[in-house]
């Protein structure tokens, strides 16, 4: 039941966000059209408003790229760690197998 509720809430919120973003208009075109009141320059609109909106978009895009890069690095480190762990366990398996062979030969 909780899964059903969560997916419905998620769909509702996604729909609401999508609908409200369609009503925003073009970024940097003045108050109420480009993401709300983003300061005096954004509210005034015009070339400076568009420039500020573009700079903000670039800032967030850059931040997103940095986060993705950090996430990729983290996952690669995890993969390397697990590969080393597999190698260590393979050596342990080989060691134990050799002990078993030695015990069989001693019989």
UniProtKB/Swiss-Prot annotation:
Q: Where is this region: N-terminal inhibitory region?
A: 24-53
Could you tell me where this protein is found in the cell?
Mitochondrion
A single GO CC term, please? mitochondrion
Task: Spell out the residue ranges making up region: Antiparallel alpha-helical coiled coil region.
Answer: 75-107
Please give the Gene Ontology molecular function terms for this protein: ATPase binding; ATPase inhibitor activity; protein homodimerization activity
Segments carrying the region annotation (Disordered) are 24-48
Extent of Gly residues compositional bias: 27-40
Coiled coil (residue ranges): 62-107
Among the GO biological process terms of this entry, one is: protein homotetramerization
- Name any one Pfam family assigned in the record: IATP
Q: Does the keyword Transit peptide apply?
A: yes
Q: Which UniProt keywords apply?
A: Coiled coil, Mitochondrion, Transit peptide
Q: Which InterPro entries match?
A: ATPase_inhibitor_mt
Assembly notes? Homodimer; represents the active form and is present at a pH value below 6.5. Homotetramer; represents the inactive form and is present at a pH value above 7.0.
Q: According to its UniProt record, which protein family does this protein belong to? A: Belongs to the ATPase inhibitor family.
Q: Which PANTHER family match?
A: ATP SYNTHASE F1 SUBUNIT EPSILON
Q: What does this protein do?
A: Endogenous F(1)F(o)-ATPase inhibitor limiting ATP depletion when the mitochondrial membrane potential falls below a threshold and the F(1)F(o)-ATP synthase starts hydrolyzing ATP to pump protons out of the mitochondrial matrix. Required to avoid the consumption of cellular ATP when the F(1)F(o)-ATP synthase enzyme acts as an ATP hydrolase. Indirectly acts as a regulator of heme synthesis in erythroid tissues: regulates heme synthesis by modulating the mitochondrial pH and redox potential, allowing fech to efficiently catalyze the incorporation of iron into protoporphyrin IX to produce heme.
This protein is called what?
ATPase inhibitor B, mitochondrial
Organismal lineage? Eukaryota, Metazoa, Chordata, Craniata, Vertebrata
Q: What gene name is given for the protein in this entry? A: atp5if1b
């Amino acid at each position: 039941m909780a899964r059903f509720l969560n997916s419905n809430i998620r769909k509702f919120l996604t729909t609401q966000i999508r609908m409200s973003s369609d009503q925003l208009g073009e970024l940097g075109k003045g108050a109420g059209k480009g993401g709300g009141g983003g300061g005096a320059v954004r509210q005034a609109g015009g070339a400076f408003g568009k420039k500020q909106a573009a700079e903000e978009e670039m800032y967030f895009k850059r931040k997103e790229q940095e986060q993705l890069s950090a996430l990729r690095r983290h996952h690669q480190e995890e993969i390397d760690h697990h590969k080393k762990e597999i190698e260590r366990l393979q050596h342990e398996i080989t060691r134990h197998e050799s002990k078993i062979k030695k015990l069989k030969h001693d019989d």
